[in-house]
UniProtKB/Swiss-Prot annotation:
GO biological process: one example: translation
Species for this entry: Methanosphaera stadtmanae (strain ATCC 43021 / DSM 3091 / JCM 11832 / MCB-3)
Assigned GO CC terms: ribonucleoprotein complex; ribosome
One Pfam entry name: Ribosomal_S6e
Listed InterPro entries: Ribosomal_eS6, Ribosomal_eS6_arc, Ribosomal_eS6_CS
Alphabetic keyword roster: Ribonucleoprotein, Ribosomal protein
Designated name of the protein: Small ribosomal subunit protein eS6
């Protein structure tokens, strides 16, 4: 299992992949919980899980416990944006726990490390020959 992790820091987002052996450390965590950013190579950072989606694109919802899919009647928020006042829809959402069939995890920075994210993700500049 490989997770795509979207790290959000103020106005900028960065995308990483979490490989098999490191993915086991975030398995079982819920939305709102924090984990060490060293798993992703972000030394000194603490990351808070804000959401995600499963392999079929269904979004994770914070108030649905477990790893199951659930058809929820929603009037806004996760998975649905109403176009008229009072409009409600039954939408399929995912539970709030990370499991094997989650494909994307959204996180935000809760504690910063020594280096900024811009420095960590900066591409090395190639020397130009003159």
């Amino acid at each position: 299992m490989v997770y795509k992790v979207v790290v959000s820091d103020e106005d900028v987002t960065y995308q990483l992949e979490l490989e098999d052996k490191d993915a086991k450390t975030v398995n079982g965590l819920k939305i709102g919980e924090e984990f060490n950013g060293g798993v992703l190579g972000l030394k000194g950072y603490k990351l808070r899980i804000t959401g995600g989606s499963d392999k079929n694109g269904f979004p994770m919802k914070e108030d649905v416990d477990g790893t199951r899919r659930f058809k929820s009647l929603v009037n806004g928020g996760t998975g649905f944006k109403p176009t008229k006042k009072g409009l409600r829809r039954r939408k399929t959402v995912r539970g709030n726990t990370i499991a094997d069939d989650i494909s994307q995890i959204n996180v935000k920075v809760s504690e910063r490390g020594e280096q900024t994210l811009a420095e960590i993700f900066a591409e090395p500049e190639e020397e130009q020959e003159e």
